[in-house]
Regions:
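Terminal domain-start leader segments
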Residues: 1-48, 54-55, 71-86, 100-118
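Acidic beta-strand-to-loop metal/phosphate-binding motif
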Residues: 86-93
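A short, polar/proline- and glycine-enriched secondary-structure boundary/capping micro-motif
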Residues: 56-63
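Domain-scale recognition of functional cores that engage charged ligands
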Residues: 96-97
Length: 118
């Protein structure tokens, strides 16, 4: 499944998918990293990563943009707010309960819904 198939999964412009697992980030972006989040909307995909990886990511990622991430609850939340996202699907099978709980609280009032289809 490529990024375009993730975009097809979304029902509308006010939905997004967040990919946080290392193996799925690498699969979708072509870039190996130990930290980062891939956010996919109907219109675009953005790989948020920290300062250790940003330069290499900007040169390497495929099918998406790379942006610097300093604090998850700020940059990604701002990205979500700017695009009026109200629902985010997250991985269900590939993340820990603590990461899932963190995403649910970090992006309030946006609803984060784990999906086993991802």
């Amino acid at each position: 499944m490529g990024i375009n198939k993730l975009q097809a999964f979304l029902k509308g412009t006010h939905e997004a998918i967040i990919i946080s697992s290392e193996e799925n980030r690498r699969y979708f972006t072509g870039f190996p990293s130990t930290h980062g989040y891939l956010v996919v909307t109907k219109e675009e995909a953005v790989f948020f990563t920290d300062s250790r990886y940003i330069e290499a990511a900007q040169k390497t990622v495929k099918n998406c943009k790379a942006k610097l991430l300093t604090k998850v609850s700020e940059e990604i939340k701002e990205y979500i707010k700017d695009r009026k996202i109200i629902k985010i699907y997250s991985e269900r099978e590939h993340i820990t309960v603590s990461v899932s709980d963190y995403l649910k609280t970090a992006f309030l009032p946006c609803k984060v819904t784990p999906s086993k289809k991802l």
